[in-house]
Design a protein with these regions (language model features):
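N-terminal leader/signal peptides at the extreme start of proteins
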Residues: 1-37
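Intrinsically disordered, low-complexity regions enriched in polar/acidic and amide residues
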Residues: 1-4, 61, 77
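Aromatic-residue hotspot detector
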Residues: 12, 19, 37, 57-60, ...
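Amphipathic alpha-helical segments typified by the pilin-like N-terminal helix
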Residues: 34-74
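Short, well-structured segments within or immediately adjacent to enzyme catalytic domains
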Residues: 72-271
Length: 271
């Protein structure tokens, strides 16, 4: 990782540590020879430490979030592998979404796509992103936050609008998102990408479906149901071909001149 001057941040942090060491050495020498410090000297030292902290803390924070993003991406890669194997076993069909749709946020939770895919990997599929700090995890009701990740609702055979597109119906599997990170507005285990082509109208799929509609932020022209900036301005996505990658949201859709935004990577029928 590099700073704005192109120098590795690890070296930058090391230089900061050396500088702090020099300041500390000077302070100890001053204390031994004079037996004390003046108020101005103490204020100067405090100011130097505050400046260094202001410089280094953002670097440490970014490094911590980068580590969380990598851990989340590892989760996504495992999901991609599991989904790809599931599709091969089920005649190119995709996993079901059987959470609490149509019954409200507190309705009984079905097995869901994560449990359907679990047998295809040796390790436990981790359903929570390290950076997902949604308060819904701690509200005492596990049904209100099923996972940090949602399945693209274009694919499952139990969900509109296509009612079960198969792998053969996906024009470009390497460019079609099947799993995205969910925001607080989606306690369910999937998101409805169908609404993304028209932010002024969100389709409804029955009672209780408002928990996972792809609602739009009219001011920003972007969805509020998917966590599009969870990791340093972007998020991790799983694609139909099984690979997972970090992207900024604007890389996952396209604006058609003279018309509203149209679905790009989220629609399996797009050319």
């Amino acid at each position: 990782m590099e700073n704005s001057q192109g120098k590795p941040r690890t070296m930058f942090c090391a230089e900061g540590g050396l500088f702090l060491g020099a300041v500390r050495s000077t302070i100890f020498k001053k204390w031994r020879t004079s037996g004390g410090f003046t108020l101005i000297e103490l204020l100067v030292v405090i100011a130097i430490i505050a400046i260094l902290a202001a410089i280094l803390f953002p670097v440490f924070s970014q490094a911590r979030e980068k580590a969380r993003s990598i851990s989340c991406l590892s989760n996504c890669r495992q999901m991609g592998i599991a989904i790809a194997m599931y599709v091969q076993d089920w005649d190119e069909g995709f996993p079901l979404t059987e959470p609490h749709e149509y019954g409200g946020a507190h309705a009984p939770v079905g097995p869901g796509w994560l449990k359907s895919c679990q047998p295809y990997v040796k390790t436990q599929l981790l359903h929570r992103c390290p950076s997902d700090s949604s308060p819904l995890w701690n509200d005492g009701d596990p049904k209100t936050r099923v996972a940090s990740y949602g399945l693209n609702a274009y694919f499952p055979p139990d969900h509109p609008p296509y009612w079960g597109v198969t792998l053969g119906g996906v024009v470009n599997p390497a460019r079609c998102v099947i799993v995205a990170e969910l925001a607080d507005q989606v306690p369910d285990d999937h998101f409805v990408a169908a609404a993304w082509g028209n932010p002024t109208k969100v389709p409804e799929f029955g009672p209780g479906s408002e928990e996972h509609e792809a609602e739009w932020d009219d001011a920003r022209w972007e969805p509020r149901s998917v966590a599009i900036r969870r990791h340093l301005g972007g998020a991790n996505y799983v694609f139909v071909d099984g690979h997972a990658k970090w992207h900024r949201f604007e890389q996952t859709w396209q604006q058609t001149p003279g018309s509203p935004p149209t679905v790009d990577w989220y629609d399996p029928k797009m050319p």
